């Protein structure tokens, strides 16, 4: 995967370096696209937002929205479709050009709805092993983890 992802000049950023590196890219006026692969469940200490996703109470990652709002960066959803083995098309859908003007969690909710449409269109294309629902919200505010 590393060779595929770096073949055309792209590079990965470690999760713990994301904010610093993206701020540096913006400060240096580096023309770039930052892509978040955000279809996995958040870690236990990052359960900030819950929504109904595929008819399940689900925690959704909020990091991409928080970074977009902090740096006022446009948000684009990439809808990937497999044409045939090894060939894909990508449709870009503008979520917002002005994240600071949107209500809190609006971007995250739009992401959840767009991702849900993609999955319902082609369920076999989603990697179901991400354990999307391993965390359960409990009314008392405590967290129950299912294995």
Show where each model-derived region lies:
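Membrane-interfacial amphipathic helices and adjacent loop/beta segments
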Residues: 1-16
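Non-catalytic C-terminal accessory region of glycerolipid acyltransferases
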Residues: 16-147
């Amino acid at each position: 995967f590393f060779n595929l992802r770096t073949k055309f000049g792209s590079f990965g950023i470690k999760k713990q370096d994301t904010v610093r590196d993206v701020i540096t890219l913006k400060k240096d006026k580096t023309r770039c696209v930052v892509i978040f692969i955000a279809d996995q469940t958040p870690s236990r200490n990052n359960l900030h937002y819950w929504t109904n996703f595929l008819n399940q109470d689900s925690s959704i990652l909020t990091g991409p929205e928080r970074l977009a709002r902090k740096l006022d960066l446009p948000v684009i959803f990439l809808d990937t479709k497999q044409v045939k083995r090894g060939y894909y098309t990508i449709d870009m859908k503008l979520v917002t050009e002005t994240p600071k003007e949107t209500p809190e969690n609006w971007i995250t909710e739009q992401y959840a709805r767009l991702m849900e449409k993609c999955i319902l269109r082609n369920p076999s294309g989603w990697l179901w092993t991400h354990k999307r629902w391993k965390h359960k919200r409990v009314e008392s505010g405590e967290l129950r983890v299912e294995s």
